[in-house]
């Protein structure tokens, strides 16, 4: 007990008398007790006021109800509650509204209006600010299209990112990046190649192999107003920093009701390539544990750069999962590399179609687009949609409108069955209420449940292939019109 030891130290060194210390302790206890009682009075007084309002409204609604006896009992029991909490009040009101379901009177309407107002207040008390509600929310950042002209260079995808990072390091003194192999060699895929030599070790730096400390450094820097990019070398390694991301970063804005911000950007790479430890796509894990963070899943490096621009204008933490197999693919370099933005929460329709909608993201976009071309050659036109971000997810209902048009939908990705594909299905079928527009069962096309096997063969047999997409779509169309699309 440090207080006891401190008292002993004071007495041993004759810094005060026993009587003086006893007086200080007594005064301190009295002060704490008084403040505790005042705090409890303030807290409980508001709840008791709500309780009295609820009791009066239930009694009023009961006057003209066939369930008057039961409603009066509910109100009386609530009135007798010792040290009530809000759950007691709201739970009783909800029971009363159920009893009043067959009634129609002003008392019931007043009780219902009171409950709806309390629902809004309690959402603000207990559920608000999971994401930013400020003017710098990612949903409020204006879209600035990428600009190209006939002279726009065609470069490797990693060079698009290199140009973007160079621009930010040049123009924003708050911006810096760090992670395993980010500094001297310019990251494992060379998006930072040469940038440490140009901008210095303080701006582009290496770290030890310790994901949790990378995340911790990033959170601290972001809290102090800097704009760090903390790199986790591969998406599979995110597990080592997941606890800190979930407990300390994703929940920060919620825990403080927007009072604290740590707009850390976690950069990583994943999805298909080769290898059990380097080609994972555990997006369902991320969706379940990192609510409160933005989750970007760009299909190429140009989209990734635009998302970084958007995030750097916002006050929200995010994770950006770049496509591991896309760094050497050719892309056009935007003329406004440091300014263009990609709107988050807004899917993009990559190909229009009338027969079926395929919803996907990341590396699967190229697979699905190739499959769509093959399907077109046999008379099946699919609409391909890139969700672009999983959190936030399609805030404008673009996917739902597509499904209303095609009446069929497949959700495809590289996560395990029941992972992110199931999340997307729930968001669209339930969240956007399109079930009644479906003419065929909604389906998912995920990867296998195991880790991706090694080699190109392992990739082919572990992850959805072009043939898998074609056959999945064809099987649905066979069900629709077996004469035109006979069974394979």
Model region roles, listed by residue range:
Residues 1-321, 324-488:
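Thiamine diphosphate
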